[in-house]
Design a protein with these regions (language model features):
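Domain-level signal for soluble alpha/beta catalytic cores
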Residues: 1-305
Length: 305
């Protein structure tokens, strides 16, 4: 570890610009389909080498923070949306395996060049339906977070938050779990072009919902790609008391599954974000690749921030 590398991810987010990794599920879509699995998270148990290779590709591209392959690894989400009735033991194993694998990849990278990397444990976004038990959702969120923490993640990152009620539950779970394991929390929302959450609510409501978890960062992800993303980020920056993270998707795919935003688009976006001091970490979401992250990393490196 270099002397300039803080051991705490919260401190890193306060003092310099970090590079986040890019998409997971879209990058693993082919492997998921080939394995006849309903979602990419299950690759962590069935075909871990595919996930490990993706982590390494993002680290090689310059990512300082990589994400666990656990976007849907919540027992109630698996049951309600994928009709996959799984035991608590299986869900725990997915999250532990994902965390352990990502941590091992960062340790290997650090051993090679002495640079500290971090692992964000990705927490599923939730949207309770009328009649759902809030306590059941809270328990499911806590179970996922505890397994990620026990697997060694540095940060619990609840991403793609798209409704306020669900975000409040996730934040309550994080407020209970994070102090127990002495790890940090962060939240990222996907929002419409008008700045509202897809299921209703303003950014002010989001910030109110997550405050209970004392997050180390709050940001935006996915949205509709880098076009217009900086404008949304400016709005969040003016409202939020927390460091900001930024990782848009590569836009909406066409009928052939091709995403419109290329690595150069992400490099240009990163230049604007850095020039305006809009984010403490920059990366990519759906449709992005190691090439997109390499473009961001080059801009961050050249900026010296």
């Amino acid at each position: 570890m270099k002397p300039s590398d803080p051991d705490n991810i919260a401190e890193t987010l306060r003092i310099r610009t970090s590079v986040l990794d890019g998409a997971t599920a879209t990058m693993l879509a082919e492997a998921t389909a080939a394995a006849h699995l309903p979602l990419a998270d299950l690759l962590c148990l069935e075909h871990p080498k595919n996930v490990e290779a993706l982590h390494k590709a993002y680290l090689d591209a310059g990512a300082d923070i990589i994400s666990t392959n656990t976007f849907n690894a919540n027992a109630l989400i698996l049951e309600k949306f994928y009709h996959a009735k799984t035991s608590e033991h299986v869900v725990e194993n997915i999250n532990r395996a994902a965390a352990s694998m990502a941590c091992q990849c960062t340790r290997h990278a650090a051993a090679h060049d002495g640079h500290r990397r971090y692992v964000a444990g990705i927490v599923a976004p939730i949207c309770p339906k009328p009649g759902d038990s809030a306590e059941e959702w809270l328990d499911a969120c806590q179970a996922q977070m505890a397994a990620l923490a026990e697997g060694g993640v540095d940060l619990l990152l609840a991403e793609s938050c798209y409704n306020i009620a669900g975000t409040r539950i996730v934040a309550q779970a994080a407020a209970r779990i994070a102090p127990h394991y002495n790890i940090c929390t962060a939240f990222s929302a996907t929002i419409n072009d008008n700045g509202t959450l897809p299921m209703g609510g303003e950014l002010e409501d989001l910030l109110d919902a997550v405050a209970v978890a004392s997050p180390s960062a709050v940001g935006l992800n996915c949205c509709n790609g880098p076009q217009g993303f900086v404008r949304l980020l400016r709005k969040l920056k003016t409202l939020s008391p927390y460091p900001t993270i930024a990782y848009p998707g590569a836009g909406l795919p066409d009928s052939a599954g091709r995403y419109p935003a290329n690595p150069q688009d992400f490099g240009q976006m990163a230049r604007t974000i850095i020039a305006e001091d809009l984010a403490s970490a920059i990366g990519g979401c759906c449709g992005t690749t190691p090439a997109h992250i390499a473009a961001v990393a080059q801009v961050v490196h050249d900026s010296g921030k």
